[in-house]
From Swiss-Prot:
This is Exodeoxyribonuclease. Its EC number is 3.1.11.2. GO terms for biological process: base-excision repair. InterPro entries: AP_endonuc_1 (IPR004808), AP_endonuclease_F1_BS (IPR020847), AP_endonuclease_F1_CS (IPR020848), Endo/exonu/phosph_ase_sf (IPR036691), Endo/exonuclease/phosphatase (IPR005135). It comes from the Bacteria. Its main location: cytoplasm. The active site is at 106, 145 (proton donor/acceptor). It holds the Pfam family Exo_endo_phos. Keywords: Cytoplasm, Exonuclease, Hydrolase, Magnesium, Metal-binding, Nuclease. It comes from Bacillus subtilis (strain 168). The record marks 217 as: Important for catalytic activity. It catalyses: Exonucleolytic cleavage in the 3'- to 5'-direction to yield nucleoside 5'-phosphates. One of its GO terms (molecular function) is endonuclease activity. The record marks 243 as: Interaction with DNA substrate.
Length: 252
């Protein structure tokens, strides 16, 4: 099974910059998960051939939002995590299949000065609780923009960014707790020591050209699936957003 996750930072903007349908066709992934779609119902007429499409919209216009394109029709689709205060921003879609749950997640940014860190920690706790409930039923593949660089190897300038949003002790510890609860960062499972592998670059100062980036987009899978991971990769050559797609090949 081939899965792709991409924070598009505005789907309409990406569709203006590239032939998005051709991209989907060329990649020929079984499942494609998008984050930060920034659209409302009816704003995009997009029905790729051979895919079932599911959208979760934020209440606030032009903000957040997720989508999943799946070749196989799921047994059920769950929008959000069942906690009203966390389900206003369209951040989670879960697809249930016979042998696995597939989730797309767009984790809230803690913002400059960590002004939203308290909410972020509440989100982390609620999300992990939800994931663990799913994992008791069948294994989970979670992907998306998790807005955290877990270790120093996961960003270009760790010392300069210590305790900035995305590299605070609280956020990194929350991700550690997630993994310790029985999950695997697929990219580090395959490439434990690979440096310079990033999925997001600031638009400022030519950061992408100089590869001054962060790895904040992930595929995280249940521990029981780790031996079925065949490859995990980052498609840094795909333009259109400040993030690039990340990919997982897994034997399901």
């Amino acid at each position: 099974m081939k899965l792709i996750s991409w924070n598009v930072n505005g789907l309409r903007a990406v569709m203006r910059k590239m032939d998005f349908l051709s991209y989907l066709k060329e990649e020929d992934a079984d499942i494609i998960c998008l984050q930060e779609t920034k659209i409302q119902d009816g704003q995009v007429d997009l029905q790729p051939e051979d895919y079932h499409v599911y959208w979760n919209y934020a209440v606030k216009k032009g903000y957040s939002g997720t989508a999943v394109f799946s070749k196989q029709e799921p047994l059920q689709v769950i929008y959000g995590i069942g906690v009203e205060e966390h389900d206003q921003e369209g951040r989670v879609i879960t697809l249930e299949f016979e042998n696995v749950f597939v989730m797309t997640v767009y984790t809230p940014n803690s913002r400059r000065g960590l002004e939203r860190i308290d909410y972020r920690m509440q989100w982390e706790e609620a999300l992990l609780s939800y994931i663990l409930e799913l994992d008791q039923k069948k294994p989970v593949i979670l992907c998306g923009d998790l807005n955290v660089a877990h270790q120093e190897i996961d960003l270009k300038n760790p010392k300069a960014n210590r305790n900035n949003a995305g590299f605070s002790d609280q956020e990194r510890e929350a991700f550690t707790r997630f993994l310790e609860a029985g999950f695997v960062d697929s990219f580090r499972h395959v490439y434990p020591d690979l440096e310079g592998a990033y999925s997001w670059w600031s638009y400022r100062a030519g950061a992408r050209d100089r590869n001054i980036g962060w790895r904040i987009d992930y595929f995280v899978v249940s521990e029981s699936l780790k031996e079925q991971i065949e490859d995990a990769s980052i498609s840094a050559d795909v333009m259109g957003s400040d993030h690039c797609p990340v990919e997982l090949i897994i034997n399901i």
